[in-house]
Amino acid sequence: MEPEPEPGSVEVPAGRVLSASELRAARSRSQKLPQRSHGPKDFLPDGSEAQAERLRLCRQELWQLLAEERVERLGSLVAAEWKPEEGFVELTSPAGKFWQTMGYSEEGRQRLHPEEALYLLECGSIQLFYQDLPLSIQEAYQLLLTEDTLSFLQYQVFSHLKRLGYVVRRFQLSSVVSPYERQLNLDGYAQCLEDGSGKRKRSSSCRSVNKKPKVLQNSLPPVSLAASSSPACDQSSQYPEEKSQDSSPRQGSELPLQFLGSSEPCSDLAREDVGCDRESHKIENGAKGTPKLRWNFEQISFPNMASDSRHTFLPAPAPELLPANVIGRGTDAESWCQKLNQRREKLSRRDREQQAVVQQFREDVNADPEVRGCSSWQEYKELLQRRQTQKSQPRPPHLWGQSVTPLLDPDKADCPAAVLQHISVLQTTHLADGGYRLLEKSGGLQISFDVYQADAVATFRKNSPGKPYVRMCISGFDDPVPDLCSLKCLTYQSGDVPLIFALVDHGDISFYSFRDFTLPRDLGH
């Protein structure tokens, strides 16, 4: 049934400038919403004229509400043009307040995504043109929501979240930090390297680091690594000399770079010298004993850098201890010593009790005489390996010498929780485990939007948005339920940000999520 035209009503075509009479009529129309309740509900028609009149009035109010067009000032609208070939909307006039959280800049132009332009068109913030003709909201729905841009379900979720006040941005897979980068705390560093266009900035520190080896390579002469070896290792020290003589001049020029830039040659020299001292010690004594250290720490004087020290001048180091192009000089450390904080830390009673409890069960590594006898890091690792081997050797032969062995080693039975963990059949797993192997098996589902909280609108920056509050994956009510493979893939792509599934059922939107949980254990038995 078509609505009857009301006398005095004004029909205004979309995009046309109103005249004075039309503007007065648009301003004077009622702002009240239609009455939602008209008394008791009639379940069946009774054929009376009163019922037909009530039904006609309800339909007339509904048609008037749907046919009413929004009137906006032309000067407050931002002009924009839809470009279907590129798939974006380009602003032809300066943007408004919405530019703080929406849109992006590329090639010096301000652009909007289709969902952003359609939402702003419904809000009355922009005027959208296509082929120099203004578009109505119905035409914009038909042109902007296609298979190449985004679906109608995605726009429903986008507009719903925007009306709730959230900041919604398109999901970029390149912005997700890998678990390895999060383990190394590189997520903040990677965020600082990205500018507004999503490109990596050049780092000045990287250029300076690359320039330093060139200067060293040109200025440092080749140095033989066997020059400081002891006489007891003459036979072993001939190999570096023969290699340096047979090598090309290019390899000889790279030798100081390797010596200065890496600690491995230094550790190799120290290891060779320590080995030579060990061999000479074994030959002199004729028995295996504790190796003698090369350095006598009683004769080495370390500078006193305490705040109460009178002598704060540090003399220049010996020239033979420095590279050829480095000049050492003395330093007065008085200003630095005055900045030292000598005040004793004041702990509360609770902190002192906790510290005392922790110290009761803490073993001091330096108190171990065997550890103090190690002269290098390699000897300390060998000591730990030897102790681990001795600890795993004592096993009852009648239990471990047969085909059937116990479920776990006695050394691993430290507590009931460890025993239950080793003998459990179902191991604890997380939803994102193994997701890197399933990146191509998402099952058609994909993450659509990054959602930021509404209270972050005032401080939100598009070039540095920060960590999203949640990530949104959109599905229809008639679509199949995602399988475990798809859930693992999407959870891995989301990283450490919670993943929310938006389920759209004929305009009604419900939100679901999958979370990890740990099964309880009975440790009392």
Swiss-Prot record:
Keyword Cytoplasm assigned: no
Single GO cellular component term: nucleolus
Region feature (Disordered): 1-46, 220-273
Modified residues (Phosphoserine): 178
Localization of this protein: Nucleus; Nucleus, Nucleolus
Signal peptide stretch: none
Modified residues annotated as Phosphotyrosine in this record: 180
Bias-annotated ranges (Low complexity): 7-23, 220-232
Superkingdom, natural source: Eukaryota
Protein name (Swiss-Prot/TrEMBL): tRNA-splicing endonuclease subunit Sen54
Protein source organism: Mus musculus
